[in-house]
Amino acid sequence: MSEIPATDATAPAEKKDFIRQIVREDLASGKHTAIRTRFPPEPNGYLHIGHAKAICLDFGLAAEFGGLCNLRLDDTNPAKEDPEFVVAIQDDVRWLGFEWAQLRHASDYFEVYYLAAEKLIRDGHAFVCDLSAEQVRQYRGTLTEPGRNSPFRERSVDENLDLFRRMRAGEFPDGARTLRAKIDMASGNINLRDPALYRIKHVEHQNTGNAWPIYPMYDFAHSLGDAVEGITHSLCTLEFEDHRPLYDWCVDKVDLSGHPELLAPLLGKGYPKEAAKPRQIEFSRLNINYTVMSKRKLTALVEEQLVDGWDDPRMYTLQGLRRRGYTPAAMRLFVDRVGISKQNSVIDFSVLEGCLREDLDAAAARRMAVIDPLKLVLTNLPEGHTETLQFSNHPKDESFGTREVPFARELWIEREDFAEVPPKGWKRLVPGGEIRLRGAGIARVDEVIKDAAGEIVELRGWLDPESRPGMIGSNRKVKGTIHWVSAVHAVEAEIRLYDRLFSVEKPDDESEGKTYRDYLNPESKRSVRGYVEPSAAQAAPEQAFQFERTGYFVADRRDHSAATPAFNRSVTLRDTWAK
């Protein structure tokens, strides 16, 4: 992919968070003439809403300051990675409205990492250790007690080089040896207590096959990957703050910009020599109530079939949110509203829902749909009567145009819009009462038909002929207006009424001996058969509508077709969870 400036799908007002202030100062001082960022996900799962914040920051920052942003897939743990996730990650980034300057993989740099590791050995900064994982834990010490040096720490440079090369040759089994940095076992930062840089894993890699029986550890590969790509500002969440000294140690001790010979393997791949010293900057991660974002827990939800897959519209993966009907514009607006800071906080889920309502209120055409149908027969109209009415597609935006809506003697209305014994303040249909049928006229109910069990199955009534659209009587005041669809023309559809997956604000809270599984909301998905006007059934997959008086819905991207319409409720018209 050619190296073009990262582009944002919107042009937001200038933001003044602390990261942007750092970038402005770096550019103003001449420390950097241009900036480069990267988004470096591991392809071992689907991206979730927390990643949206990082994506918008990494790509948005580059776009805002005329820089570049790479997409780098951190594929250093092949046992857990899958090409399926690689495709999904790229799809998610593009869906959010961003394009990368270059698509890179950590595996592109495996030869560079290896040469860098040999340099550390030659410089006396790394050694091959034979301790087992359990022994390493015992030697590491605790937060209050210093660690102990490995008995293999003082091996000679020649012995370390020999052992490391034999590790690469595949001579030793998994876990037999590691390459460790030689830093300080007494450091107050446990990450600096001679951390592992390489481990032995005889696992086939999706890109390199069986060429490598050893793989770099995250901190080593991540820091050098940034340096290799000339990243100026390496942005990550606060849990990596304690890793920053190790990040800097790796960058400084390897010194790629001062040792261009280490970059020689890249020249054959056509990669430019652009090594630089990156700066790691941490920001608070995105925490939202009523959610879990642990990859382990999300995986369990899928594997235990508590949800219908990674793109279940109740999931907090970007694939799930997209299928639910969340839009890229709403996601970007949400990230802007949340902001960037170093203070951890929990964002109310209603903020996310509010951003979607705001976007769809402006962007979604209106349609009529009935999700719990009750038949209303207008007996003063002739048998078989039908006609075509003109409706505006959007009450606030004439550019959406108009559409034809069929009207007939027999209609479907919402069951909840009729009350035989109305509560106080009721403004909808009652026996003998009048209501305005949206865009069609004023109707009255004269007769209630029930089945043998006493259930209401049909209403019979009258349509005031003087109240039709354009007539003087259409201005006559009545208490309320309801929507409807023609029973003759309406298309039956599956209507999926989604809600929050968890019923409590903190599903991760296990203080009462419960787990997140115990807090699953039994009302998070309800599927009903309803009716939609014909133009709604003709929607393209992922087309969003406001179903009038009902909520915002999207044509399911997997299951919807004109013959078998399927709509997912994206969000209700109002916050039904407000306290």
Curated annotation (Swiss-Prot):
Keywords: Aminoacyl-tRNA synthetase, ATP-binding, Cytoplasm, Ligase, Nucleotide-binding, Protein biosynthesis. A motif ('HIGH' region) lies at residues 41-51. It is found in: Cytoplasm. Its EC number is 6.1.1.18. It comes from the Bacteria. L-glutamine binds at residues 74, 218. It is an enzyme of class 6 (ligase). Its main location: cytoplasm. One of its GO terms (cellular component) is cytosol. The keyword S-adenosyl-L-methionine does not apply. A motif ('KMSKS' region) lies at residues 292-296. ATP binds at residues 42-44, 48-54, 237, 285-286, 293-295. Pfam families: tRNA-synt_1c (PF00749), tRNA-synt_1c_C (PF03950), tRNA-synt_1c_C2 (PF20974). One of its GO terms (molecular function) is glutamine-tRNA ligase activity. GO terms for biological process: glutaminyl-tRNA aminoacylation; glutamyl-tRNA aminoacylation. It catalyses: tRNA(Gln) + L-glutamine + ATP = L-glutaminyl-tRNA(Gln) + AMP + diphosphate. SUPFAM superfamilies: Nucleotidylyl transferase, Ribosomal protein L25-like. Monomer. PANTHER family: GLUTAMATE--TRNA LIGASE, GLUTAMINE-TRNA LIGASE. HAMAP family: Gln_tRNA_synth. Belongs to the class-I aminoacyl-tRNA synthetase family. This is Glutamine--tRNA ligase.
